[in-house]
């Protein structure tokens, strides 16, 4: 059962080619993209065979269906290359996290701020979390002040996507990078 499912997942809908085209008449497009016109399927197959290429159904929804004379293997290869190139150029946005404490000293604050700036410049989102321990929960306003300071310091690099909210003993805020022009 699993093996069958695995094969189904790989199977991609392929365009009907040559004898697999069921229409009687087709609108034929030549090798160089020129319109040949509406011809019978037998005539279209003969023209494709003379050119030693395949007859590929491009648009099955049209009446009559649109078919093109091309090298189908080369067409699949080009399509695969385009998909790979598009995938390669796509950047996966990650969420990077920096953790603060209510008593974070100035030196540590500057280091963490520098890292946040780097994350935002790289195009990643930044999650700023502030953890309270023990009796620090009584002074949540200190945490809010710290997150406001982070927000102000990062104003030129990013915008707040999720404003500070308390979840258990943690205050969290998400900052997204500004769109580049």
UniProtKB/Swiss-Prot annotation:
**GO CC terms for this protein?**
cytosol; membrane
Q: Which Gene Ontology molecular-function terms are recorded?
A: ribosome binding; translation initiation factor activity
Q: Give the main localization category.
A: cytoplasm
Tell me if Cytoplasm is a UniProt keyword of this record: yes
Q: Which UniProt keywords apply?
A: Cytoplasm, Initiation factor, Protein biosynthesis
Which is one Pfam family of this protein?
IF3_N
Family matches, as Gene3D superfamilies? Translation initiation factor 3 (IF-3), C-terminal domain, Translation initiation factor 3 (IF-3), N-terminal domain
Localized where?
Cytoplasm
Q: Which domain of life is it from?
A: Bacteria
Signal sequence residues = none
Disulfide connectivity for this sequence is none
Q: Which InterPro entries match?
A: T_IF-3_C_sf, T_IF-3_N_sf, Translation_initiation_fac_3, Translation_initiation_fac_3_C, Translation_initiation_fac_3_N
Q: Which GO terms describe its biological process?
A: ribosome disassembly
Q: Write out the function statement from the record.
A: IF-3 binds to the 30S ribosomal subunit and shifts the equilibrium between 70S ribosomes and their 50S and 30S subunits in favor of the free subunits, thus enhancing the availability of 30S subunits on which protein synthesis initiation begins.
Q: How does it assemble?
A: Monomer.
Which family does the record claim for this protein?
A: Belongs to the IF-3 family.
* Name by which UniProt lists this protein: Translation initiation factor IF-3
Q: Which gene encodes it?
A: infC
């Amino acid at each position: 059962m699993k093996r069958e499912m695995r094969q189904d997942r790989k199977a991609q809908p392929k365009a009907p080619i040559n004898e697999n085209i069921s229409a009687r008449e087709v609108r034929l497009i030549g090798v160089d993209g020129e319109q040949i016109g509406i011809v019978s399927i037998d005539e279209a197959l003969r023209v494709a065979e003379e050119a030693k290429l395949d007859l590929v159904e491009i648009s099955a929804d049209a009446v009559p269906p649109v078919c093109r004379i091309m090298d189908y293997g080369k067409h699949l290869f080009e399509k695969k290359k385009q998909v790979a190139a598009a995938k390669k150029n796509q950047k996966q946005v990650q969420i990077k996290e920096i953790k603060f404490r209510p008593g974070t000293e100035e030196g540590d604050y500057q280091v963490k701020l520098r890292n946040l700036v780097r994350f935002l410049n790289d195009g990643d989102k930044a999650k700023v979390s502030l953890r309270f321990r023990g009796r620090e929960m009584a002074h949540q306003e200190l945490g809010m002040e710290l997150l406001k300071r982070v927000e102000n310091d990062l104003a030129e690099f990013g915008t707040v996507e999720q404003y500070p909210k308390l979840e258990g003993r943690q205050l969290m805020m998400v900052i997204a990078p500004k769109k580049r022009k």
